[in-house]
Regions:
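Conserved GNAT acetyl-CoA-binding A-motif
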Residues: 106-118
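Conserved beta-strand in the GNAT
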Residues: 52, 58-67, 79
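Conserved acetyl-CoA-binding loop-helix of GNAT-fold acetyltransferases
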Residues: 85, 91-104, 130
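Conserved beta-strand-loop-alpha-helix junction that forms the acyl-donor binding cleft
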Residues: 115-125, 143
Length: 152
């Protein structure tokens, strides 16, 4: 399998959202439109990186790196916000290449750590640990999403 990992371009956004739709069923069409809008912004932001793996023209993988400052870490923290790979042969190779590029990009941007949110699947934890990630406790999240106000 011959593919290339590179920074995403605006012209890739439609193919990226199509890949996300095929690989992760939790997104509905309205959410995918919001994802596309956000990706269009992230392509240009210095505190993010949107990377794609392309095989000829099709996008076969995507990874999103987001940066945030951290006083506790005394620097920037990189977060692997999203990784999606076309299922099938070569998926592990594509995911590995995307992850290596995310690590390189995070280092180049001055990150002290790279974090990834884990699912509850112990097998997934083991896969990340094989790649060099270490368990670092749990996080609590408070949603700041706005909810629509209903009128009576």
């Amino acid at each position: 399998m011959e593919f290339q990992v590179r920074d995403a371009r605006l012209t890739d956004i439609e193919r990226i959202t199509a890949l996300i739709e095929r690989t992760d069923t939790r997104w509905d069409s309205a959410e995918l439109n919001q994802v596309a809008d956000l990706l269009r912004q992230l392509v240009y932001l210095p505190n993010a990186a949107v990377l794609v793996a392309v095989e000829n023209k099709p996008v076969v993988g995507v990874a999103v790196l987001a940066l945030r400052p951290s006083v506790a870490a005394n620097g920037l923290i990189g977060a692997l916000d999203l990784i999606a790979v076309e299922p099938g042969s070569g998926a592990d190779e594509i995911a590995g290449a995307l992850l290596r590029e995310v690590v390189r990009s995070a280092r180049n941007k001055g990150c002290r750590e790279l974090e990834v949110a884990l699912a509850d699947d112990p097998a997934e934890h083991a896969q990340w640990q094989k790649l060099g990630f270490k368990a670092a406790g749990q996080r609590l999240i408070y949603s700041l999403a706005r909810t629509p106000v209903t009128t009576r």
